[in-house]
Each structure stands twice: as structure tokens, then as C-alpha cells.
Amino acid sequence: MATNITHHAGITRNERNQLRKQKGLTIWLTGLSASGKSTIAVELEHQLLQRGLHAYRLDGDNVRFGLNKDLGFSDADRNENIRRIAEVAKLFADSSSIAITSFISPFRADRDTARKLHEVPTPNDSTGLPFVEVFVDVPIEVAEKRDPKGLYKKAREGIIKEFTGISSPYEAPENPEVHVKNVDLPIQEAVKQIIDYLDSKKLLDA
């Protein structure tokens, strides 16, 4: 890390919150491929926007077309993938937006790093930013049966290496803020669980 740089602080987060009439936070969806993360994230974004809240969704596949197109799927690259996304999500949250991330993020340590990053106050602010971990939980058998992209089949055939749940581990969250058991659960109910939690913590209040 460079040592000859300084952080240029401008307006405070509280000033931004007042201007946008909302607080910023990050909602971090994690789970196996085909668990339903992206589908839930899309509907969650829509519902937040309908409530007049500024939200932005960061999706695992989409980000790899741009910001993270130089990364593969080794453990080191997965770590860097999540580190970058955590930094970007924090920027959105610090701007008084609601960042919704939808990434497998298989390693517990990486998710903990993302959380701790949000807990560190930015210059000019005395507190960190809310970080809400949402575990979209389905058994591997269910995810593999869904397999909309045919990725599990390719992983079983050895075409895709280091595939989470097959040849690379997924470390389930131990204490997520929201635990969505997404087997035969209507999308509206899955999103309701998340919004109910946010409302209970007054995270969507101005």
C-alpha cells in the first residue's frame, strides 16, 4: 500500500443522508450458484426503488465483465474479487445508497473482511456502515438440479475446475443477519424476510 497518499474528506455522511433522505448500507447476499441470489437481488432492488430508496445492485457475473475481468477462479482470485466488491459496495453505502451485492463469496474469511471494512469509519465520520449478510440457503442437491447455466454438469464432467460446492468448498455463514431457506420459497416471501429485517433495525428510515 502506498504511504504517500492522504484521504481527502469532504461532506459528512450525515449531510449526505439528510440530502438523500436515507441511510447507506450494504446488503450482502451469499450462497451457492443457483441458490437464487441474483433473482432475489433483482426483486429486492425493485422493491426498494418502489419505496423511493436509492439502491444499486452489484452482480457476480456482471462485475466479471468489467471491474474484475482480469480475475479467474483460484482461491487468490476469489479473495481479490470479493475484496474489490467490498470496497465498491462501501463506496455506494458511504454515498447514502443501498448496495446490494450478489456473489457466491464462498469463503467465510472474505465475507468477514468485507464486514470489517464497513465497520471502519471513514474520515469525517465517527461510525462505520451497516453490513447485512443474507445467506441464501439451498442444499447442493437442489442447486445442482436447478443448474440454469449447466455449470454443475460441467463441473461434474471436469470441464470447469474449482467450482464451488463440487471441487471447491462453500463455507456457510454461521450468524447471518438474514437466513433465507430458498427451497420452494416464493420470491416475494424471500424479499419480505430481508425487508422485514431492515425495517426492524430501522435501516430504511431517513
Curated annotation (Swiss-Prot):
Disulfide partners: none
Enzyme class: transferase
Enzyme Commission number(s) from the entry: 2.7.1.25
Keywords of this entry: Amino-acid biosynthesis, ATP-binding, Cysteine biosynthesis, Kinase, Methionine biosynthesis, Nucleotide-binding, Phosphoprotein, Transferase
One family name in Pfam for this protein: APS_kinase
Gene Ontology MF terms: adenylylsulfate kinase activity; ATP binding
GO biological process, one term: methionine biosynthetic process
Superkingdom, taxonomy of origin: Eukaryota
Active site: S105
Binding residue positions for ATP: G31, L32, S33, A34, S35, G36, K37, S38
Substrates-to-products reaction catalysed: adenosine 5'-phosphosulfate + ATP = 3'-phosphoadenylyl sulfate + ADP + H(+)
Cross-referenced InterPro entries: APS_kinase (IPR002891), P-loop_NTPase (IPR027417)
Pathway: Sulfur metabolism; hydrogen sulfide biosynthesis; sulfite from sulfate: step 2/3
Stored PANTHER family: BIFUNCTIONAL 3'-PHOSPHOADENOSINE 5'-PHOSPHOSULFATE SYNTHASE, PAPS SYNTHETASE, ISOFORM D
Family per record: Belongs to the APS kinase family.
Reported function: Catalyzes the synthesis of activated sulfate.
Protein's recorded name: Adenylyl-sulfate kinase
Species of provenance: Emericella nidulans (strain FGSC A4 / ATCC 38163 / CBS 112.46 / NRRL 194 / M139) (Aspergillus nidulans)
Gene: sD
